[in-house]
Amino acid sequence: NADTPLPPASMSKLMTLYMAFEAVADGRLRIDETLPVSAAAAAYGGSSMFLDTTDRVTVEDLLRGVIILSGNDASAVLAEALSLDGTEAGFARMMTARARQLGMVNSTFKNSNGWPDPEHLMSMRDLGILADRLLTDFPTYYPLFSERSFAFDGRVPANSQNRNPILGLGIGADGFKTGYTDQAGYGIVGSAKQGDRRIIFVLSGMDSSQQRAEEAEKIINWAFRQFAQKQVVDAGTIVATADVWMGDLPSVGLTVENDLSLLVPLIGTANGVTAEVVYTGPIAAPVTKGQQLGEMVITLNGLPESRLPLVADRDVAKGGFNMRLRTAALVLWEKFAPLTPLPSLPSLPDAPSDAPS
């Protein structure tokens, strides 16, 4: 079940990375800024950068330490720097709140790195949402996930290799993150690109690192053989119109701002794509061009639905007094005489929009 909360192990570090990338983007952190290492961060065992309390480490090195070395200590250093109260626990609460804003409704964080805790849980769907947002929101940093090694200042040379087993297999794999604990088993959030097609997948609960590597490779090969990219909607397409209440126009077009393409099965898709426009109307004037007014919900043969924002294709100002009177009359007529043909209303010169009403 993709929505069942499970122990995510180190895959939850992707949330710490997302929030660190946000902090760099909005200026709360600088990529060349150095951060201190607390005793609590240095005390972490497991996968590590082997930091100690005498270190001051750049944000860039810490990001590589989390991505490539899966450093529990590096995650904690970033967490303490970003937390409002300077603690990892405080940062974990921020992670949970931010996850909700991103639509990750089945994730709860108790630390920055996936250290075992019975209440630290993520669903596989939430991990997929997070991976997609990392790729979409921070493409500049995505190449870090495909780096094969990182020897932080030469210490512990044996601990310098990326743990992602699908990198370098020649199948287009270029991210994201592995994870392992006794409770979680072996897992991976992975991504691969071949041509203009990209897939993101999540595996959890594997019995061994070898099984994880084999299953991840199988998924990539299967996905690119069995699925094709299909353009569903072109940017700028008006897919529906919505009635406007008290506007200087009776309706407004609902359009999509970005292309939408889906990976669809090569077999059995002839009539499998359906789309539904969802909005609450009539829309009250004024309406601003680009204002989100609804969603288009796309379903494909029982696969998870995709939702695309629908925005206004133009500005619609408030109508003048006569236009508002005409609109009210039409609504009242439709409410109280729905079966009677509506008579033609005479055209009236519209009053200025600032006329008293």
Model-derived features with residue positions:
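Active-site-adjacent loops and short helices of periplasmic peptidoglycan-processing enzymes
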Residues: 1-138
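Domain-terminus/edge residues, biased toward the C-terminal soluble/receptor-binding domains
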Residues: 104-108, 116-121, 125-357
